Amino acid sequence: MDRLVRAELLQKDEDGVVRPGLRLWEMASRSAPSMSLARTAMPFLVDVQSVLRQHTQLAVLDDDGVLVLARLSSQGAVVNQADVAGRLPPFTTALGLVLLAHAPVETAERFIARHRDRLGAVVDHHPLESGRAVPAGVRARVATPSEPRLRALLADVRREGYAAVDGALDEESRGVAVPVRGADGVAAAALGVVVPREAPYTPGVPPLLMTAARGIARGLGGHSH
């Protein structure tokens, strides 16, 4: 492992947590389709971020959860648990709900079956797992919805076209996300923001994100409506 750290393929922080290193991330950025997606999306993330000046992020669904591909943040923005190349919970975040709601049915069902033991459970949030102190306002333990509740939430997201989650990971934050559709019409990614829970402008956030998502979809050659 030390050799990988020296080669910048891995990095170890002061708490001993090992993460992908800069060189590994750069190598992935040049080759992975998801990184091509992130590059296509970046101008639209910048546009959203310039309006809201909080956190704007792009994510995809993989076997283990919600993988964050890109994040833009402004100084003084509300707390946000997302890290680039890190993962977020799939059942308690706006990004996760959008990705599951707009995934192919078989993909969503397979994912739910794989993680069924997490549904209806109260789980430790990752700051505790990594041995770090939990910042004020960050929930140390997160309750996931039951399977019937999850399915109702996903139906709501499909009907409304976006997901909004208040205070699931951070008490003062609201996550809002929309799908970015690929050529097959299903979600290739999710575009989301984290904003203050009581922000007066939140009703305008879904239309803003939908406009940006359509632009990304056009860039990908996908569905733009």
What are these regions (language model features)?
Residues 1-38, 218-222:
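N-terminal helix-turn-helix
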Residues 10-11, 58, 180:
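A structural signal for short hydrophobic beta-strand segments in well-ordered beta-sheet cores
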Residues 23-51, 71, 77-81:
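Conserved segment of winged-helix/HTH DNA-binding domains
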Residues 45-53, 57, 154, 217:
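Short regulatory alpha-helical segment in sensory/regulatory domains of signaling proteins that mediates
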Residues 58-63, 71-72:
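Short hydrophobic alpha-helical segments used for membrane anchoring or interfacial signaling
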Residues 78-169:
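Short, solvent-exposed recognition segments
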Residues 128, 136-225:
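Extended hydrophobic
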